[in-house]
Amino acid sequence: MNKAIIFLSFTTSQNQSIQNCIDYFKCSDSKNTDLLIISNAGHIPNGITDSNQLQLTKVTNWQQGFKQIFLRQNSRKLHSFVKSIPEYDEIEICVPHFLNILCSYFVNFCSQKLKSSNIIISLYPDGMLSYQPFEIHSQFQMESIYRWFGGWLSGMRYTLFSGPVADPFSCVKKIYSYIPDITIPYQSEKIIKIKFPKKKLHGNNIFILGHVKQSKFDLDYLKQINKKILLLLSKENYGSIYYKPHPRIANMSHDAFYQSILKIPDINIKLCHDDTPVESLLESIGASIIIAAVSTSMINLKLKYKNQISCYYFGLNDYVHPKYATYYESVFSYLSIKPLRDPYE
């Protein structure tokens, strides 16, 4: 059977999961399968020929936004790419979720132009979305309206929905997952286990990950976190301390968490502004201890490096809606990701 698999992505972390899917396909019987990717993120996975890659522009400023509105560069490139895809017996479209203009537009509209009578929609892992049924309760919430308006202006229509962001249209037939046992199945017919390649870590540094929702923690709470970090530092034999701010925080003066930990006595922090995926960055800096505010990056790090690293989280009940907190606790417990208070209180 002549088959194609089309991956859609918009973050470097998603491209890491796509790479793991590709590695899975290489180990299975996929001789007659062509791999394609449409992405606006860097670090395109290996194993996809240049002619099967479409690199879209990530809109990060007003100038790029105006180009998409008036010239519709991404939309034009996408339509041309879809038109160039030959006929296949089966085409599988792999997305992380549908809370994104590209994924929504491609599945709901571009897929109709693909030359195949058998179109399959699949999910690949993206943080916690494989393990919690995160939902949009109203299709008219403000963020959804912004996406609809942005899609309309750029020529890539976004379909409003309410329901689980991973499968709002009940169209997913296949799910790729690192932990099938606790994966939300939705209406899928098959859950396929993928995995990270085995990697050896060298180093004893500490890696602290920043978060985007700064308002979730007040100054008093951050002071308590500082005490716990200080206690951890007093009990661990470590080299250097690295801090990676969240990509959406451009000005470090707006990073309240970072400004807070700078006040820890005698602490010396090295900043990582690299856009390299956290999983790859960890190897280059040689970190074995990770601290973060329930960052889903810790899930991938634990899956990849297992007992070579220790992960500690804080702020679960403040950062995550109570409805989903139990799902986080389940995954964190499964992977031995511990609250910062344990065993440092």
Predicted regions, residues:
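Conserved catalytic-core segment of nucleotide-activated headgroup transferases in glycan assembly
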Residues: 206-252
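Nucleotide-activated donor-dependent transferases that construct or modify glycoconjugates
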Residues: 2-11, 207-211
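A nucleotide-sugar donor-handling region in carbohydrate enzymes
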Residues: 125, 130-134, 138-216
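Active-site and donor-binding regions of nucleotide-sugar-utilizing enzymes
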Residues: 6-160, 297-298
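Donor nucleotide-activated moiety binding/catalytic core segment of transferases
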Residues: 251-299, 303-304
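Active-site regions of enzymes building and remodeling cell-envelope glycoconjugates
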Residues: 47-65, 139-146, 189-191, 204-205, ...
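Catalytic binding pocket for nucleotide-activated donors in carbohydrate/polymer assembly enzymes
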Residues: 297-345
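Structural motif
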Residues: 3-6, 90-94, 205, 240, ...
